[in-house]
Structure formats: C-alpha cells, structure tokens
C-alpha cells in the first residue's frame, strides 16, 4: 500500500511486483490515470493529502524513505496510531524541550533492512 504516484512510491510498487506482491495505490486525486504503472489496485480518493491517513491506517508497518512534508505527515499519523515506522534517510523527530515525544522511528541503512524491520512489525501486530 502506498500513495500510488511516482518516485519512491513507484519504486516501492515495482519492488513489490517483482517479488510477486499485489500493490495498492491510494491516490490523492480522482484521476486513476495518475497511478504509476506498477499499481494493481487503484483507489482514487479526491482527498488530496488527507489520503495519507488512509495509507497509514491500511498498514501494519510504514517504511519512510527520505521524503517531504507528505512523508512527515504519514510518519506522524503512524506514530500516533501505534503503527511501526521504519526510516531510511528520513525525518528525525527532535522536539525541543520535550520528553513526551521521542524519535520512535526505527532507523535502517538500506532497503533490505527496511523491509525486514517492517515485516517484524507486521508479525507482531497481526
């Protein structure tokens, strides 16, 4: 499950397909044609960035790779929902003068480690 567009989302779908997986793209717009070519199931929401909540709520683990504010919002939604977040060169949660919020992202150094850590989270939550 991912946002279904290009870039990292497309590469995630390509990797999943090459391993025999089924891919789901939850698009921000209403035009299904914007889905990357590796998406099997297209969900065109028309929700804009609000679709990030649907992406996170559909997952047992989230892998965050680099990313902009959309990725940051997905990380925040996941942490708030108790969904395991695995990070590869992504945001760091440094909140000044706060002991309540800590960086709960599991840091990895390559894609294989990211998938392995995400799968651990799926096993523990299923």
Model-flagged regions — what are they?
Residues 42-46, 88, 103-117:
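Short acidic-hydrophobic, aromatic-tinged amphipathic segments that line or gate anion-handling sites
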Residues 95-100:
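Short, aromatic/basic amphipathic alpha-helical patches
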């Amino acid at each position: 499950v991912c946002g279904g567009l290009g870039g990292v989302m497309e590469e995630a779908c390509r990797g999943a397909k090459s391993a025999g997986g089924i891919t789901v793209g939850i698009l921000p717009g209403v035009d299904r044609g914007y889905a990357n070519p590796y998406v099997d199931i297209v969900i065109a929401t028309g929700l804009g960035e609000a679709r990030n909540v649907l992406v996170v709520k559909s997952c047992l683990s989230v892998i965050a790779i680099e990313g902009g504010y959309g990725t940051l919002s997905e990380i925040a939604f996941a942490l708030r929902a108790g969904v395991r977040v695995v990070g590869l060169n992504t945001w760091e949660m440094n909140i000044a003068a706060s002991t309540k919020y800590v960086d709960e992202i599991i840091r990895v150094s390559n894609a294989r480690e990211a998938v392995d850590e995400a799968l651990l989270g799926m096993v523990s939550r299923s």
